[in-house]
Amino acid sequence: MGQFISFMQEIPIFLQEALNIALVAVSLICIVKGLVNLYRCGLFQLMVFLVLAGRSCSEETFKIGMHTQFQEVSLSLSALLTNQSHELPMLCLANKTHLYLKSGRSSFKINIDSVTVLTRSADVFVHSPKLGSCFESDEEWVVAWWIEAIGHRWDQDPGLLCRNKTKTEGKLIQINISRADGNVHYGWRLKNGLDHIYRGREEPCFEGKQCLIKIQPEDWPTDCKADHTNTFRFLSRSQKSIAVGRTLKAFFSWSLTDPLGNEAPGGYCLEKWMLVASELKCFGTLQCQVQPKSRLRVCDMLRLFDYNKNAIKTLNEETKTRVNVLSHTINALISDNLLMKNKIRELMSVPYCNYTRFWYVNHTLSGQHSLPRCWMIRNNSYLNSSEFRNEWILESDFLISEMLSKEYSERQGRTPITLVDICFWSTEFFISTLFLHLIGFPTHEHIRGEGCPLPHRLNSMGGCRCGKYLPLKKPTIWHRRH
């Protein structure tokens, strides 16, 4: 878009060149002829026929009245099941026997068997939703929520057993749902809760046998997909609402600045900012000395920055001084070397330069000239111009070549590359549409020997494809024009 705007702004300038006018004329002719060829080839008419044919046979939407229509809308609930902390949980049933639970970055596996792992004497006995001794804070609320969702009541039902999270065996919680003696109603209630949130699971517990639920952290299996229906069942089983509180973290920041607010590593001001709002607090050298003891660390840090700043400044000054001394030494050596070379050439009668007289080639028509070159001396007298005739002839050739190259570059610069691209692609467009015009496309289909049944699309039996008209059993043919 920027290139096109620049091209439009430069139209009055580049139209001053005859070549640019020719390129514009060729581009316009090719575009116009290409559009004419594209229209005459029948491609547009064929596309319009294929799009509109048969539209009168059916409606796009089901209309109930004049201004009422039957429509639908779909919602994507995948955003509710994100992989962040304190989000809605996901449940999975793998192979009808393996139960899984996931919320945020924590995932768990639920096993139901008859093997006793935890005992009341060696492990932790819990009878409240506070499971801090069993799981981490991010996992504690998820497990407590799941236990309540399957029907456990902390104030009425038996307590649970869990392994201390500091043990190396791993985190684990055990629930006894054996339907025997006085535990039968409790076991049936938790079983119904499991059947509700894990639809289609197989029951591994049998009457009269011990049955235990074990919950332990485990990676979420790859074959488990996010299903919001399981989450809805889980939420419907919950007995209370959970409001998760969120706090802002790392919202404010501080930086060292000068009194004007510009960032400076050695500044004595602290700038507190939040997005665009800021607050500036400055500490001078004398103010630092009278600050309370709680702010001595801030003062020491500012003094350290000031010391480092002065050290860097001193190092830069010393470096500049040494570089200048080295440059003067090198220049002196070069000057001595040139003087010695000229003296040797004078002794050997070799032409040399004394840097007092120079020659150059001047182009009188354009006023341009070449770079000055030294006029050589031999035996204390300047050389005759005929003695270095080849040199100034070559210099004149170089000058003319440079002038021609510069003029060519200026002419090229006055022809925008966008105009060249337009001319090239318009020519390609014209050639392509010319072939399409020579080939030709059929524009519609109708019954042979009869009129055009537009906008209906016919089948091989001469009837409308949508079924509005009965098959006439007549041959059809494609025509190019109406």
UniProtKB/Swiss-Prot annotation:
Pfam families assigned to the protein according to its UniProt record, in alphabetical order: Arena_glycoprot
Binding site for Zn(2+) 2: H444, H446, C452, H482
Lipidation (N-myristoyl glycine): G2
Role noted for this protein: Stable signal peptide (SSP): cleaved and functions as a signal peptide. In addition, it is also retained as the third component of the GP complex. The SSP is required for efficient glycoprotein expression, post-translational maturation cleavage of GP1 and GP2, glycoprotein transport to the cell surface plasma membrane, formation of infectious virus particles, and acid pH-dependent glycoprotein-mediated cell fusion.
GO cellular component term of the entry, any: membrane
Topological domains annotated Extracellular: 2-17, 54-58, 59-421
Segments passing through the bilayer: 18-32, 34-53, 422-442
Organism in which the protein naturally occurs: Tacaribe virus (strain V7)
Glycosylation sites noted in the Swiss-Prot or TrEMBL record: N83, N95, N164, N176, N354, N362, N379, N384
Residues at the site labelled Cleavage: S58, E59, K249, A250
Keyword check for Phosphoprotein: no
GO terms of molecular function: metal ion binding
Membrane topology, Cytoplasmic segments: 33, 443-482
Cystine pairs: C92-C224, C134-C162, C205-C211, C269-C282, C353-C374
GO biological processes: fusion of virus membrane with host endosome membrane; receptor-mediated endocytosis of virus by host cell; virion attachment to host cell
InterPro entries the record matches: Arena_glycoprot (IPR001535), Arena_glycoprot_zinc-bd (IPR043015)
Protein name: Pre-glycoprotein polyprotein GP complex
Domain of life assignment: Viruses
Site (Important for GP-C-mediated membrane fusion): K33
UniProt entry tagged with the keyword Glycoprotein: yes
Gene3D superfamilies recorded: 6.10.140.1590, Arenavirus glycoprotein, zinc binding domain
UniProtKB keywords: Disulfide bond, Fusion of virus membrane with host endosomal membrane, Fusion of virus membrane with host membrane, Glycoprotein, Host cell membrane, Host endoplasmic reticulum, Host Golgi apparatus, Host membrane, Host-virus interaction, Lipoprotein, Membrane, Metal-binding, Myristate, Transmembrane, Transmembrane helix, Viral attachment to host cell, Viral envelope protein, Viral penetration into host cytoplasm, Virion, Virus endocytosis by host, Virus entry into host cell, Zinc
Family assignment from sequence similarity: Belongs to the arenaviridae GPC protein family.
Domain notes: The cytoplasmic domain of GP2 plays a role in ER location. It also contains a zinc-binding domain that allows SSP retention in the GPC complex by accepting a cysteine from SSP as the fourth ligand.
